[in-house]
Amino acid sequence: MDDKITNVLFAGIGGQGIIKASDMLTEAAFRMGYDVKKSELHGMSQRGGSVSSDVRFGKKVFSPMIPAGEADYLVAVTEDQIAVCEEYLKPGAIIIRPSDFPEEVANSKMLNIAMLGRLNRYLKFPEDLWFELIRQSFKAEIAESNIAVFRAAANKEA
């Protein structure tokens, strides 16, 4: 394990599963043996307020907040959040956005899980770890649908 800190910024609107997705990434990174820090910012979701979550992991992480210009990844559950978060992105940052997915996924309640699948193309955590976390986070009938969406997004089918 090198000294690199990986910075993932999640952004969207209240109710879109931003916190659920960032919680799952936090747990996955922890189970992979990383030191993990997480922060959340909750807007007024009843009025379409922004919600964001910073997840930072590496050998040793001291602050939960991603400094401006250091986000490696942006997981934006709404397209308009990309401009809002731009100052946090490092040059060459990977942006995962709804338009990366077919309409039936982009407009579903499983978009956050699909985005984790797409993110895992870069993180390369074991799929079985993600499937276990999905099963722990959702009821059985919902979990299997989420696993299918995760798998498709991770394997470039969605």
Regions found by a protein language model. Give the residues of each.
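Active-site cofactor/cluster-binding pocket
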Residues: 1-158
